[in-house]
Structures are given as C-alpha cells and as structure tokens.
Regions:
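Left-handed beta-helix
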Residues: 1-136
Length: 136
C-alpha cells in the first residue's frame, strides 16, 4: 500500500463532494460527486452527480507527450468536459470538451461500445478512451 499526498485543488469549487488522496484538480466545478484516488481534472471541467473511480497510476510527461502526438486524451477528465449523473471507472481518459449525460434524457439500458447504460445511469468502463468532443 502506497501513501499518496493530499489532493491538490487549484482555483476549484467543490460542493457536497469528496476527493480521495492524490487528486489534481484545476479550475473545475464539482458538486454532489465522489472523486477517486489519483484523478486528474483539468481546467473548466464540471462534474455533477458523478462517481469517478480514479486511476491506478499517474501519467509521466513522456506519456502525455506521446498522447499529444497521437491525439489521445490524457488520463482523467479533460479541459471543459461536462459530466452529469455518470459512473466513470478507473483509468478512463475523458477528452477535452466531452459532454456526458447533460441532456437529462431517458436512456435505454445496454452496451453501447465505449459506454454502458445500467438502470438509466451512464457507465464508462475501465480503461476507456473518449476522444475530445464526444457526446453521450
């Protein structure tokens, strides 16, 4: 078992939420949510009613550079992503500007590839990559 530093929250707002150790949250708005260990939430992101399981590791600068070259999102929640009423499993990469569950529409249960609907709740499985601008 490793010991992680306390979460680092820069210019962020948390309301009725909790963040586990090792999170890095920058200029984000989080309400009625649980943020798991080592979660990175980038600038302008908004979470409401979200359970985010976190990550098993931190990405290195080399990994982030490789992601940029391949146009892949980094581990965690990308810039400007808006997520409502969802469960995000470990090691998910949610790209910049993604919109998840923001329309409040009823969804039919099922497996939709990069996500599932279970009892009307959007579930992003472990290790999923959602590219920038994805709308669910």
């Amino acid at each position: 078992m490793s010991t992680l530093p306390p979460s680092k929250m820069n210019f962020s707002n948390m309301n009725q939420s909790i963040a586990s150790e090792g999170c890095i949250i920058t200029n984000a708005s989080i309400s009625n949510s649980i943020v798991g260990v080592r979660t990175t939430i980038e600038s302008g992101a908004s979470l409401n009613g979200v359970i985010c399981m976190g990550a098993d590791y931190y990405e290195t600068e080399e990994q982030k550079k490789l992601n940029e070259e391949k146009r892949l999102p980094n581990l965690g929640i990308g810039k400007g992503a808006i997520i409502k009423g969802a469960i995000i499993d470990k090691n998910a990469c949610i790209g910049e500007g993604c919109r998840i569950g923001i329309d409040n529409m009823s969804r039919e249960d099922g497996n939709y590839g990069h996500y599932h609907i279970v009892n009307g709740i959007i579930v992003i499985p472990k290790n999923t990559v959602l590219y920038p601008g994805t709308v669910i």
